[in-house]
C-alpha cells in the first residue's frame, strides 16, 4: 500500500517531517576501494584502465582500442532507426536554442570615481562527460550534458562510457556526434573519472567532469574534486505532481509511473485536495503497472517510496511543495500559472495538464539534469553557466588610486597585513 499522508491528521507535521528525511539510497562504503582505483590510474595510466576494464567490464581494450573510432560511430548511425535519429536531432536543436538564451554577457562600466569595473565570461577549455553503460545508457542524457557545453564554447568535449562485454549503445554514439562530442572512450567506472581528472597516455585530462553514475562514480567524483570541477552528485529521480480532481486520473498515473520506472529508489508523489481523485489515480497506477516492460522496477519504486499527500486546499500545497523541493514539479490545477511565482524550490516546473514531465526529459528544450534529494533548495539544474567561468576586471588610474588608496591602507593595517598596505602606499609616496 502506498504511503498516504493527510494534512487533517493531528500528527501530519511529524509524519511529513519523517517523510522528508527518509533515505532512498543505500550508501555503499566504497571510498577505500575507489581511492585505490583512482590512485592506481593516476600512477599507471592506460595499463590500469586496461586491467580494470578486463576485470569489471569483461572487455580487452588492447584489442578494441580505448578510443571509439569514427568508423564505429558511422556504423552506429547505420544501425540506428532513422526515425529515432530524427527525434534526437529535434531534441538537440531545441536544447541548443533554449540554452543559447542562457549565454551571459560581458559587462564593463566606469563608476563615479572613474574606476573601471566589469566581468568577462569564458568557456571552460575541456570537459568530460560520464555516460553510464547498461540499462541507464540514455542518448537523451548525452544531449542534455553535451549541448550546453557546445553552446558555451567548450573547445573539447570528452565522453567516457563503459562497454560491458564490448557492447555500446549505438544511440549513445549517435547522440554524441549530433551534440559535437570531440572524443569518445570506452571506459567506465571510477577508473574513467580518474582518467579524465589526471590523464593517461591516451586520454588527456579535462577541467570539469559532468554526468551521472553509480556509487563508485559518485565517490570518484568527490575524490577528484579540486583537481577538476564537478557538476553535482545526483540521487534517484523524483516527481511531485500537484493535481486537482479535474485531471484525468490515467494521465496523472502515467506521469507518476514515468518516474517510478527509472529506478527502484525513484520517488513519485501525488499531492491533491480530493481523496476520491487520489484513489482513482492509485487504481490507475495499479492498472498501468502491469503493462510496463519495467514492471518490477516501477512496482518497487511505487510500493517503497511512492506517496499520496492529501491537503485541505491548494493554498496549503505551496509551502509543502517548497519543503519537498522536488527535482520535477508538475502543477496540474485550474490556475497553474498563479502557482509558479510562489514556488521557490524545484528543479524544473511543468505547468498545466498538457505538460508532462517526460516532454522535459526529451524534447522540451530545458535541461533534464536537475538537483535531487531536496537539493533544489540551494542548487539549480545544469545550464550553459556550468561550462563557463566569470573573471572580474578592475582598472584604476593614478587619480583613482589616490581616491581609494588611503582606505585600502587603513583596512590592511587594521588586519595586520603590512605588505598589503605597502603595495598601495609605495605608489602614493606615503
Swiss-Prot record:
Its cofactor is Zn(2+). Substrate binds at residues 237, 259, 262, 328, 361, 415, 420. The keyword Amino-acid biosynthesis applies. It catalyses: L-histidinol + 2 NAD(+) + H2O = L-histidine + 2 NADH + 3 H(+). GO terms for cellular component: cytosol. The active site is at 327 (proton acceptor), 328 (proton acceptor). Binds 1 zinc ion per subunit. Its EC number is 1.1.1.23. Keywords: Amino-acid biosynthesis, Histidine biosynthesis, Metal-binding, NAD, Oxidoreductase, Zinc. Transmembrane segments: none annotated. CDD domains: Histidinol_dh (cd06572). One of its GO terms (molecular function) is zinc ion binding. Pathway: Amino-acid biosynthesis; L-histidine biosynthesis; L-histidine from 5-phospho-alpha-D-ribose 1-diphosphate: step 9/9. GO terms for biological process: L-histidine biosynthetic process. Zn(2+) binds at residues 259, 262, 361, 420. It is an enzyme of class 1 (oxidoreductase). NAD(+) binds at residues 130, 191, 214. NCBIfam families: hisD. Belongs to the histidinol dehydrogenase family. Catalyzes the sequential NAD-dependent oxidations of L-histidinol to L-histidinaldehyde and then to L-histidine. HAMAP family: HisD. This is Histidinol dehydrogenase. It comes from Brucella melitensis biotype 1 (strain ATCC 23456 / CCUG 17765 / NCTC 10094 / 16M). The gene is hisD.
Amino acid at each position: 500500500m502506498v504511503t498516504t499522508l493527510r494534512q487533517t491528521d493531528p500528527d501530519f507535521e511529524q509524519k511529513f517531517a519523517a517523510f522528508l528525511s527518509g533515505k532512498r539510497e543505500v550508501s555503499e562504503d566504497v571510498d577505500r576501494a575507489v581511492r585505490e582505483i583512482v590512485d592506481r590510474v593516476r600512477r599507471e595510466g592506460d595499463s590500469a584502465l586496461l586491467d580494470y576494464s578486463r576485470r569489471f567490464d569483461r572487455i580487452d581494450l588492447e584489442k578494441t582500442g580505448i578510443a571509439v573510432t569514427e568508423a564505429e560511430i558511422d556504423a552506429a548511425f547505420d544501425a540506428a532507426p532513422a526515425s529515432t535519429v530524427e527525434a534526437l536531432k529535434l531534441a538537440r536543436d531545441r536544447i541548443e536554442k533554449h540554452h543559447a538564451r542562457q549565454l551571459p554577457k560581458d559587462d564593463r562600466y566606469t563608476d563615479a570615481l572613474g574606476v573601471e569595473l566589469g566581468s568577462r565570461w569564458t568557456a571552460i577549455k575541456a570537459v568530460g562527460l560520464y555516460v553510464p553503460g547498461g540499462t541507464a545508457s540514455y542518448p537523451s542524457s548525452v544531449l542534455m550534458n553535451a549541448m550546453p557545453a557546445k553552446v558555451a564554447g567548450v573547445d573539447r568535449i570528452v565522453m567516457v562510457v563503459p562497454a560491458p562485454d564490448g557492447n555500446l549503445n549505438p544511440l549513445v554514439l549517435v547522440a554524441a556526434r549530433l551534440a559535437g562530442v570531440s572524443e569518445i572512450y570506452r571506459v567506465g567506472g571510477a577508473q574513467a573519472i580518474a582518467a579524465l581528472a589526471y590523464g593517461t597516455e591516451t586520454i588527456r585530462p579535462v577541467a570539469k567532469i559532468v554526468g551521472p553514475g553509480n556509487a563508485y562514480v559518485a565517490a570518484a567524483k568527490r575524490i577528484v574534486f579540486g583537481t577538476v570541477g564537478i557538476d553535482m552528485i545526483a540521487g534517484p529521480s523524483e516527481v511531485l505532481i500537484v493535481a486537482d480532481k479535474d485531471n484525468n486520473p490515467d494521465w496523472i498515473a502515467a506521469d507518476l509511473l514515468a518516474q517510478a520506472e527509472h529506478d527502484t529508489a525513484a520517488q513519485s508523489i501525488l499531492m491533491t485536495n480530493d481523496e476520491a481523485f487520489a484513489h482513482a489515480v492509485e487504481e490507475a497506477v495499479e492498472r498501468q503497472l502491469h503493462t510496463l516492460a519495467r514492471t518490477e522496477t516501477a512496482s518497487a519504486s511505487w510500493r517503497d517510496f511512492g506517496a499520496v499527500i492529501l491537503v485541505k486546499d491548494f493554498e496549503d500545497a505551496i509551502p509543502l511543495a517548497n519543503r519537498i523541493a522536488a527535482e520535477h514539479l508538475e502543477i496540474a490545477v485550474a490556475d497553474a500559472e498563479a502557482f509558479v511565482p510562489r514556488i521557490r524550490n524545484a528543479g524544473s516546473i511543468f505547468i498545466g495538464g498538457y505538460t508532462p514531465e517526460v516532454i522535459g526529459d526529451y524534447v522540451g528544450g530545458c535541461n533534464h539534469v536537475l538537483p535531487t534529494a531536496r537539493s533544489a533548495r540551494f542548487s539549480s539544474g545544469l545550464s550553459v553557466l556550468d561550462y563557463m567561468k566569470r573573471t572580474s576586471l578592475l582598472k584604476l588610474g593614478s587619480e583613482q588610486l589616490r581616491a581609494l588608496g588611503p582606505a585600502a591602507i587603513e583596512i590592511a593595517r587594521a588586519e595586520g597585513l603590512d605588505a598589503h598596505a605597502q603595495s598601495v602606499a609605495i605608489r602614493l609616496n606615503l
